């Protein structure tokens, strides 16, 4: 299936397929597989596959078509966890709530901004600061942070000249992470960072998405306050 055909099919449910759509849009010649209304897309930055499944048997149907080795994959519906566990022995499943943002609907809202915070584009001088406050082992690597800063719309927050927060876009196009110094929380700095990042990101992609751990209530509140819409529970699977 070619890029145009895949986007036409996936756009029938843009929210549910937001991650696959944004991935296909940014790739010149994406690897796409389809079977009976289900889809698999290869994401080359992270060497993962992204699945949109129509039924419980679709994962087993698509798997033999895949051309690359992979150690993790995404499925846009947590209900298919039993099928993933059956097909991949020892699979480790991590559920998330997925949010999405339609670029055509985003309006830069100055009411969300804190006028006391200065927002700047990130450069590599921020890398040490980011590593000092961002401790997720999978992504807390200097080379990874530098690649995000060099290639994607990432921003930092300054309060009276001091670094107090940042927001990144992952190399696979996923929005986030965002971090604000604990002593500076409650001042709208995260919402301000979101507004600047969304403004740049929506110029690059027709739709964006992010994933929040189910029990991360602070991030859920921030997403709701920022106008990002919930799509549903999804899963990342390590095999």
Where are the language model's segments positioned?
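Acyl-donor-binding surface of acyltransferase catalytic domains
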Residues: 38-114, 237-239
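Conserved GNAT acetyl-CoA-binding A-motif
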Residues: 68-78, 201-214
């Amino acid at each position: 299936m070619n890029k145009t055909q895949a986007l036409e099919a996936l756009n029938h449910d843009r929210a549910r397929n937001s991650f696959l759509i944004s991935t296909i849009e940014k790739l010149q010649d994406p690897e796409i597989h389809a079977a009976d209304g289900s889809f698999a897309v290869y994401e080359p930055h992270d060497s993962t596959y992204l699945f949109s499944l129509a039924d419980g048997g679709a994962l087993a149907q698509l798997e033999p078509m895949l051309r690359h080795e992979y150690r993790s994959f995404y499925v846009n519906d947590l209900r298919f966890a039993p099928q993933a566990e059956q097909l991949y022995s020892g699979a480790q499943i991590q559920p998330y709530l997925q949010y999405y943002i339609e670029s055509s609907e985003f309006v830069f809202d100055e009411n969300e901004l804190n006028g006391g915070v200065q927002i700047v584009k990130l450069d590599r001088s921020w890398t040490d600061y980011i590593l000092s406050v961002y401790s997720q082992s999978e992504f807390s690597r200097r080379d990874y942070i530098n690649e995000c800063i060099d290639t994607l719309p990432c921003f930092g927050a300054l309060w009276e000249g001091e670094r107090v927060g940042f927001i990144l876009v992952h190399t696979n196009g996923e929005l986030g992470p965002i971090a604000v110094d604990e002593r500076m929380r409650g001042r709208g700095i995260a919402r301000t960072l979101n507004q600047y990042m969304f403004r740049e990101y929506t110029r690059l992609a027709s739709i964006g998405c992010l994933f929040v751990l189910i029990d991360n209530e602070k991030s859920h509140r921030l997403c709701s306050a920022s106008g990002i819409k919930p799509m549903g529970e999804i899963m990342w699977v390590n095999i």
